[in-house]
Each structure stands twice: as C-alpha cells, then as structure tokens.
Amino acid sequence: MNKARKTYVLKLYVAGNTPNSVRALKTLKNILEQEFQGIYALKVIDVLKNPQLAEEDKILATPTLSKILPPPVRKIIGDLSDRERVLIGLDLLYEELTEEDWEAQSNL
C-alpha cells in the first residue's frame, strides 16, 4: 500500500539581500534538508519587491518564517539559527520522532 507523505509548505519573508536575510535562508535550508528532505516546499518572498504579499499575510518584521501546511499556521520572527527553537516554534519537532524514539521514551 502506498502511504501518502505529508508535505510541509513554508514561506520565508526577507527584506532584500541583507546579511540577516542571507543567514536566515541558509540556516533554514540546512534545517529543512536535514529534517524534511524531499517533503517540503519553501517560497522566499522579498518584502521590498512584493510589499503587497507581506501586507496580505500581515508580516511586520523580517525575517519571518511561516508554516502554511500542515495546519495550524505558525510564524517565527527573527533569528532562525536555533534549530530546536525553529522546529518547536513551527510545531514540527514532535513529528520528527521515530519509532525508536518513542520506544526509548517509553522505557524510561
């Protein structure tokens, strides 16, 4: 039987090609490739080029990372360098636990 794989849809709002924007994108791509390789879609939105998109999504600061799917929508504003903080903030940390993790926890 073919199991449907969950896809994570994220948007990263940045302001131009600033050091903060570049660092946020690089860090986020590293996290996504390590944890969700092949099961994510990331759209990078430059709010200087597309201010209407930022306004529609009520983005007030950059960088802002928004998880669109799966629900619920979650947002993280600012520094994305702390992997665990990003995963918890987006409500993704617990979904990465494997069966072995669950077994190890139940044996405690």
Curated annotation (Swiss-Prot):
InterPro entries: Circ_KaiB, KaiB-like, KaiB_domain, Thioredoxin-like_sf. GO terms for biological process: circadian rhythm. Keywords: Biological rhythms. SMART domains: KaiB. It comes from the Bacteria. The keyword Ligase does not apply. Homodimer, interacts with KaiC. The KaiABC complex composition changes during the circadian cycle to control KaiC phosphorylation. Complexes KaiC(6), KaiA(2-4):KaiC(6), KaiB(6):KaiC(6) and KaiC(6):KaiB(6):KaiA(12) are among the most important forms, many form cooperatively. Undergoes a major conformational rearrangment; in the free state forms homotetramers as a dimer of dimers. When bound to the CI domain of KaiC switches to a monomeric thioredoxin-fold (KaiB(fs)). KaiB(fs) binds CikA, leading it to dephosphorylate phospho-RpaA. Has 2 forms, fold switches to a thioredoxin-like fold (KaiB(fs)) when bound to KaiC. Belongs to the KaiB family. NCBIfam families: circ_KaiB, PRK09301.1. PANTHER family: CIRCADIAN CLOCK PROTEIN KAIB2 (PTHR41709:SF2), KAIB-LIKE PROTEIN 1 (PTHR41709). Key component of the KaiABC oscillator complex, which constitutes the main circadian regulator in cyanobacteria. Complex composition changes during the circadian cycle to control KaiC phosphorylation. KaiA stimulates KaiC autophosphorylation, while KaiB sequesters KaiA, leading to KaiC autodephosphorylation. Phospho-Ser-431 KaiC accumulation triggers binding of KaiB to form the KaiB(6):KaiC(6) complex, leading to changes in output regulators CikA and SasA. KaiB switches to a thioredoxin-like fold (KaiB(fs)) when bound to KaiC. A metamorphic protein which reversibly switches between an inactive tetrameric fold and a rare, thioredoxin-like monomeric fold (KaiB(fs)). KaiB(fs) binds phospho-KaiC, KaiA and CikA. KaiA and CikA compete for binding to KaiB(fs), and KaiB(fs) and SasA compete for binding to KaiC, thus the clock oscillator and output signal pathway are tightly coupled. This is Circadian clock oscillator protein KaiB. It comes from Nostoc sp. (strain PCC 7120 / SAG 25.82 / UTEX 2576).
